[in-house]
């Protein structure tokens, strides 16, 4: 069985990576996507980015797994390279650690005959042959098919938004929430702004809940309903985030729901506070 290996940090995963992994799956029987991380190096890279939210190593692993979850011949795992010296000096230690991790998954692996590295990085071919004895298939090393790389995205995420898979967009999307009093025109304003900026929006779920579950008025609203309202609102927010164009517009936040709960029920709600 031919084994393919794709290695990257994927900060963040973009469609150039997706293309690389997808094409790798057509060259071999099984692909392992190695999501490498280094605590110090990753922290510096992310802190110097324009992301509004941290991307952890497990976030990156989830992006890969979610993107390829329907393809059984693509597997992925985290690989800690924190203790490896910088490349190229670190190649020897790095390769021995990766061999050990791979052989946990594929015992008695014949690195010379059974393994193919798939990469878009220059010089990988030389080092993979030297330290693994394995060949390398280079795909789009000049970034001609997808003219973007991760550092450009980190510098300006909105400029390269179209190159991000949905899983990554949902994680990184800026959320703009508009709050105000009841029946003050928030919903219509959100709708107009979403049209102008060609993006998605989420209306206040509380009003929808009252109509669907309480017969159209709040007379029967009680303490247990507030949790259902915030969960429904969260579902709407996640949908808007997943389908947004660079940012999502949201009508009302969770603090407003908590304020209504405190006012009308005279009780705090720790579940709402978690949001």
Where are the predicted features?
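Hydrophobic positions on the alpha1 helix immediately C-terminal to the Walker A/P-loop
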Residues: 189, 193
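Conserved substrate/cofactor phosphate-moiety recognition/catalytic segment
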Residues: 195-235
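Short, structured active-site "lid" loops
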Residues: 50-70, 219-246
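Nucleotidyltransferase catalytic core that binds NTPs
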Residues: 1-174
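Conserved glycine(s) of the Walker
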Residues: 185
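Hydrophobic anchor at the beta1->P-loop junction of P-loop NTPases
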Residues: 178
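The conserved Walker
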Residues: 182
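ATP-dependent NMP and nucleoside kinases share a basic, alpha-helical "lid"
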Residues: 105-107, 127-131, 253-275
């Amino acid at each position: 069985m031919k084994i393919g290996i794709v290695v990257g940090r994927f900060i963040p995963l973009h469609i150039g990576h997706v293309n690389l992994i997808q094409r790798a799956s057509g060259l071999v029987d099984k692909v392992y996507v190695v999501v490498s991380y280094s605590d110090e190096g990753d922290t510096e890279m992310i802190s110097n980015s324009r992301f509004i939210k941290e991307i952890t190593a497990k976030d990156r692993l989830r992006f890969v797994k979610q993107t390829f979850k329907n393809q059984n011949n693509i597997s992925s795992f985290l690989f800690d390279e924190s203790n490896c010296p910088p490349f190229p000096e670190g190649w020897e230690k790095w390769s021995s650690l990766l061999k050990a991790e791979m052989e946990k998954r594929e015992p008695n692996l014949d690195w010379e005959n059974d393994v193919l590295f798939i990469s878009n990085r220059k010089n990988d071919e030389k080092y993979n042959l030297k330290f693994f004895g394995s060949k390398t298939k280079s795909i789009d090393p000049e970034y001609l098919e997808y003219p973007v790389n991760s550092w450009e995205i980190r510098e300006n995420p909105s400029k390269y938004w179209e190159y991000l898979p949905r899983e990554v967009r949902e994680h990184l999307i800026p959320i703009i929430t508009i709050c105000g009093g009841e029946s003050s025109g928030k919903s219509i304003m959100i709708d107009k702004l979403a049209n102008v900026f060609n993006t998605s929006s989420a209306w206040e779920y509380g009003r929808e809940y009252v109509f669907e579950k309480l017969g159209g008025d709040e007379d029967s609203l009680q303490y247990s309903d507030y949790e259902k309202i915030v969960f429904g609102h969260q579902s709407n927010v996640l949908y808007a985030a997943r389908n947004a164009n660079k940012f999502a517009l949201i009508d009302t936040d969770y603090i407003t729901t908590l304020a209504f709960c405190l006012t009308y029920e005279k009780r705090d709600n720790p579940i709402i506070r978690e949001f």
